[in-house]
């Protein structure tokens, strides 16, 4: 069976997010001062062939650990769509 899986990768909460800071500054320059914080990450969509949903999640998790997310600076979440 084919599963659509999304991997959400975000900077660790305790680390500075320079992209988020740049976006926040830009938003404030546009007069959108009510926005308090911005964190910039990435969404990666995979199409995975697997025997069941648990196997698809395991494959996506392994791909995230090995390549798609940097464990030193980022965390990830796997979501089956």
Report each predicted region and the residues it spans:
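Long, contiguous binding/interaction regions
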Residues: 2-81
